[in-house]
Regions:
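N-terminal loops that bind phosphate or other acidic moieties
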Residues: 1-345
């Protein structure tokens, strides 16, 4: 077992994580009913992490801090949809915690996972439990607890993933949309060595995943677990597979083998309050610019608001009926670089 995560190992872990969710993206799409029933969480998360994988293939990170920084920057720039932006935030917080480190042992990696969760909760304007936020939070806590007991990274991550799946199962009753659809959340599946941390995180994540159905009223209504939570756990499982020397998944499973699938026909379009899924990137006018006034404005004209940022740019995801107003207001904080607007009806 690996005692510590190096830059080269972290790179391979991300490549494995990207392959794992790509192989199951349609299964994740089939669970996606929250925050809106558009069936694209698997696609968005897989394409988001694919940008990090591409960036890492071109890099030769000399440390875990550098590898995680490349990953976080690429994820922010390539984030698609609500689930992609939240995924980028989980790794942004992790990257900040690993900054300057040559290698990371179980305790350091577990603590970094927890920092990622804190970053995600802080960036989401109205955090909803029974989602990837719940799954990642409980998984990270399990990772920290397991690492504190002296477990290696593999064992720690596996335990966290197990806990995450347990929480995911409860997302259906926690979220009414998932309960109605009958699925879980799509976005959220040697002492101090990395393997133990990942084992614990995966174990905890698995435990956390199941309850997401009960925790989120939307998921409960749909009868599914959280798609984002499931997707996150798949990425962690791929990372753990690299630590264990297991192969990267190559083929996506056939649709008929899916055990869970949301009934999208049962999810009426009137549940979509805001029509346009709006995602855009703004280059900051200055590094220390205060985005709180912008957060307040955007939350007043839409929902599902998430803002991720690094030193030079910020990325906004919001559902709104007035995307033009969102873009105009945001340009007070810098220069618009990229925008994508989709009609969700």
């Amino acid at each position: 077992m690996s005692k510590e995560i190096t830059g080269a190992l972290f790179k391979q872990m991300i490549l494995h994580g990207a392959a794992a969710i790509t192989a199951q993206k349609q299964a994740i799409n089939d669970l996606n009913v929250f925050p809106v029933p558009d069936g694209d969480t698997g696609t968005n998360m897989s394409m988001t992490i694919a940008t990090a994988a591409e960036a890492l293939r071109k890099a030769a990170p000399s440390s875990v801090g550098q590898a995680s920084s490349v990953t976080a920057s690429a994820l922010l720039q390539g984030a698609r949809g609500n689930s992609g932006v939240i995924l980028s935030l989980l790794f942004r917080g992790l990257s900040k915690a690993l900054k300057g480190m040559e290698t990371a042992d179980a305790a350091a990696f577990a603590a970094a996972m927890q920092e990622g969760v804190a970053a995600a909760y802080k960036a989401v304007m109205k955090p909803a439990e029974g989602t990837v936020l719940t799954v990642s939070r409980l998984a990270a806590k399990r990772a920290v607890d397991t690492a504190a007991e002296g477990a290696d990274v593999e064992t720690t991550l596996a335990a966290a993933i197990e806990e995450g799946y347990d929480a995911l199962a409860q997302t259906t009753d926690m979220n009414p949309v998932l309960k109605k659809a009958g699925v879980v959340d799509a976005g959220g599946k040697t002492p101090n060595a990395p393997e133990a941390v990942l084992e614990a995180a995966i174990a905890e994540g698995q435990l956390a995943l199941e309850p997401t159905t009960e925790m989120n009223p939307v998921l409960k209504k749909a009868g599914v677990v959280d798609a984002g939570g499931k997707g996150y756990l798949l990425i962690l499982e791929g990372m753990l597979a690299e630590l264990r020397g297991e192969p990267i998944p190559e083929n996506e499973e056939e649709p008929e083998t899916h055990k869970e699938k949301a009934d999208f026909n049962a999810m009426a379009q009137e549940e979509i309050t805001f029509t346009f899924d709006t995602v855009y990137v703004v280059r900051k006018a200055r590094e220390d610019i205060d985005l709180m006034p912008l957060r307040a404005y955007l939350s007043s004209i839409g929902d599902s608001l998430v803002i991720g940022e690094d030193d030079e740019t910020f990325k906004v995801h919001v559902h709104t009926n007035t995307p033009g107003a969102a873009l105009t207001e945001s340009q007070k904080y810098g220069t618009l670089e990229l925008a994508k607007i989709e009609n969700m009806r």
